């Protein structure tokens, strides 16, 4: 009965006015419940090391073990393929610099969604949120989970593809395990991220070390200039763009730290520091991992391989070749954890702004974790794995993802124009967003020309959010029966998950971490020119 009495003092009564927006903070209940002695809010438990592992862990998933084949296929030579990997890291660095400025100018969790909502208004932010929650992150999580299960099951089925049912069951078991971990403790989740990020870096360090040993022994024929730039097909701008898109998939996840800004210790310092440490490190690791691949395999061998890292291990590691599939499995396990951690904060931020049901803006009374948002992310991913063709959906996801990146960085220029006097602890050179947007526009135009169906479906997915926005957010005078239903469901969900609205988090956003005014108002309307 102790648990029920504590919960009763924290049950929230959502207002019946139907206005979207941040939910009110609860009043502490009587007695020694958690609200009376300690504020219920998201805790600042992510330090610099954990922040770096979130970025590195989300970027390094299965991409570096799979993408080299696609990059080489469209580049036409070893030398140009290596150039594409360096270029991908450079463009990612430009984008991350822009996100660092936005992250300290708009110190709110939610990443792209928070920035687009703040700069362009509620509709634009909702469309980004809708596409992310509906398809982008559930599909990415499903693909990473399926990759994890396939590599774990590979030793059990060495001569054939693992059964689809076994892969799905193992994927869902992994997903539910990590959902439970993230629901139980932020500290547990970040420790898992640190451990598995360290593991995947050790695995890639092994590949790079073996590659350097090969070079010192003189086995680098494919890297000699005469061979490295021996093209087996005539290079073109179109093929180079496709190669870059293949490589950019391996860099996806670089913006995820911005989703958890409010849980960072001293975000104005640690957000840019983590970005400046992580992106160059990942670019270095990716480039020299590919150099190592080419010391063991010819371009033809690499193109014929379905799992480049596994082939590398079989050729050079001998008895220890089992290390490679295990490394990929560990890498994807950490990737699932990172995606769950950050995508749940996106749901949390969207609900707090009134763009998703208010129940998703609640956290556990004692654990201070966003359990409802985590359960929604887990459930949406499970549905995609059961009924969706994940590898077809990922094509649409890539287009939507890149579209969101460009719109967000365009928002940086809009913010510079509308609020020139805004205090910016970090202010990048204007050429940084301009160069990034030039690359972005080029890839977007080329994508429309080469894959009009994929781009068209991606835009349709985004636009399906327009009627949902007007029905669920813009229409405020809903019938009373709708309010009664949502209130009863919210109360039932609170009792089931033992959650309440966070206390004090909104006030901190409005007043700043040290009682100073926040640089931007909390609103879902576009900023006005001053």
UniProtKB/Swiss-Prot annotation:
Highly expressed in brain and lung, and to a lesser extent in placenta and small intestine. Expressed in a subpopulation of astrocytes enriched at glycinergic synapses in the spinal cord and brainstem (at protein level). Expressed in OLIG2-positive astrocytes of the lateral globus pallidus (at protein level). Expressed in CD34-positive, DPP4-positive mesenchymal progenitors in developing subcutaneous adipose tissue. It catalyses: L-alanine(in) + glycine(out) = L-alanine(out) + glycine(in); L-serine(out) + L-alanine(in) = L-serine(in) + L-alanine(out); L-threonine(out) + L-alanine(in) = L-threonine(in) + L-alanine(out); L-cysteine(out) + L-alanine(in) = L-cysteine(in) + L-alanine(out). One of its GO terms (biological process) is positive regulation of synaptic transmission, glycinergic. The keyword Nucleotide-binding does not apply. InterPro entries: AA/rel_permease1, AminoAcid_Transporter. The chain crosses the membrane at residues 46-66, 78-98, 119-139, 192-212, 274-294, 316-336, 368-388, 394-414, 430-450, 454-474. Disruption phenotype: Mutant mice develop hyperekplexia-like phenotype due to impaired glycinergic inhibitory transmission. Administration of glycine and L-serine reverses the phenotype. One of its GO terms (cellular component) is plasma membrane. Residues 21-33 have a biased composition (Pro residues). Keywords: Amino-acid transport, Cell membrane, Disulfide bond, Membrane, Transmembrane, Transmembrane helix, Transport. GO terms for molecular function: neutral L-amino acid transmembrane transporter activity. It is found in: Cell membrane. It comes from the Eukaryota. Induction: Up-regulated upon adipocyte differentiation in response to INS. Down-regulated by treatment with rosiglitazone. Active from pH 5.5 to 8.5. Residues 1-36, 508-530 are annotated as: Disordered. The keyword DNA-binding does not apply. It is a multi-pass membrane protein. Disulfide-linked heterodimer with the amino acid transport protein SLC3A2/4F2hc. Belongs to the amino acid-polyamine-organocation (APC) superfamily. Associates with SLC3A2/4F2hc to form a functional heterodimeric complex that translocates small neutral L- and D-amino acids across the plasma membrane. Preferentially mediates exchange transport, but can also operate via facilitated diffusion. Acts as a major transporter for glycine, L- and D-serine in the central nervous system. At the spinal cord and brainstem regulates glycine metabolism and glycinergic inhibitory neurotransmission by providing for glycine de novo synthesis from L-serine and glycine recycling from astrocytes to glycinergic motor neurons. This is Asc-type amino acid transporter 1. It comes from Mus musculus (Mouse). The lineage of its organism: Eukaryota, Metazoa, Chordata, Craniata, Vertebrata.
């Amino acid at each position: 009965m102790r648990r029920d009495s504590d919960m009763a003092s924290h049950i929230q009564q959502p207002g019946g006015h139907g206005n979207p927006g941040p939910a009110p903070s609860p009043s502490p209940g009587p007695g020694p419940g958690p609200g009376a002695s300690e504020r219920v809010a998201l805790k600042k438990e992510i330090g610099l090391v954990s922040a770096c592992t979130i970025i590195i862990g989300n970027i390094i998933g299965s991409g570096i073990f799979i993408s080299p084949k696609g990059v080489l296929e469209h580049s036409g030579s070893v030398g140009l393929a290596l150039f594409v990997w360096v270029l991908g890291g450079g463009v990612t660095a430009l984008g991350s610099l822009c996100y660092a400025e936005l992250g300290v100018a708009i110190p709110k969790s939610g990443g792209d969604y928070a920035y687009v909502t703040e700069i362009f208004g509620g509709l634009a932010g909702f469309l980004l949120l809708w596409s992310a929650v509906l398809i982008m992150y559930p599909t990415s999580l499903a693909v990473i989970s399926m990759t994890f299960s396939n590599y774990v099951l590979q030793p059990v089925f060495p001569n054939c593809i693992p059964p689809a049912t076994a892969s799905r069951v193992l994927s869902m078991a992994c997903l539910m395990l990590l959902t439970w971990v993230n629901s139980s403790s932020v500290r547990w989740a970040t420790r898992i991220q640190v451990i598995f990020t360290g593991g995947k870096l050790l695995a890639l360090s092994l590949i790079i070390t073996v590659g350097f040993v090969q070079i010192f022994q003189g086995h680098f024929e494919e890297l000699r200039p005469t061979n490295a730039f021996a093209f087996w097909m005539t290079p073109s701008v179109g093929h180079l763009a496709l190669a870059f898109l293949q490589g950019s998939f391996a860099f996806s996840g670089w913006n995820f730290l911005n989703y958890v800004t409010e849980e960072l210790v001293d975000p104005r310092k640690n957000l840019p520091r983590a970005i400046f440490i992580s992106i160059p490190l990942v670019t270095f690791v990716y480039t020299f991992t590919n150099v190592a691949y080419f010391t063991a395999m010819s371009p033809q061998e690499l193109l014929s391989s379905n799992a480049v890292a596994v082939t590398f291990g079989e050729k050079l590691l001998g008895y220890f070749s089992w290390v490679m599939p295990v490394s990929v499995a560990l890498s994807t396990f950490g990737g699932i954890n990172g995606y769950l951690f950050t995508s749940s904060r996106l749901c949390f931020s969207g609900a707090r702004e009134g763009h998703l049901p208010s129940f998703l803006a609640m956290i556990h009374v004692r654990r201070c974790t966003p359990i409802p948002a985590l359960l929604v992310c887990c459930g949406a991913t499970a549905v995609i794995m059961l009924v969706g063709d994940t590898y077809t959906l990922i094509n649409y996801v890539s287009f939507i993802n890149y579209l969101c990146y460009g719109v967000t960085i365009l928002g940086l220029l809009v913010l510079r124009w509308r609020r020139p006097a805004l205090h910016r602890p970090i202010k990048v050179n204007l050429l940084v967003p301009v160069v990034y947007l030039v690359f972005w526009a080029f890839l977007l135009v080329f994508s429309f020309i080469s894959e009009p169906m994929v781009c068209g479906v991606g835009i349709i997915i985004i636009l399906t959010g327009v009627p949902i926005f007007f029905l669920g957010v813009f229409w405020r005078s809903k019938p009373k029966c709708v309010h009664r239903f949502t209130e009863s469901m919210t109360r039932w969900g609170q009792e089931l998950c033992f959650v309440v609205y966070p206390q004090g988090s909104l006030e901190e956003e409005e007043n700043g971490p040290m009682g100073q005014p926040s640089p931007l108002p909390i609103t879902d309307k576009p900023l006005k020119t001053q």
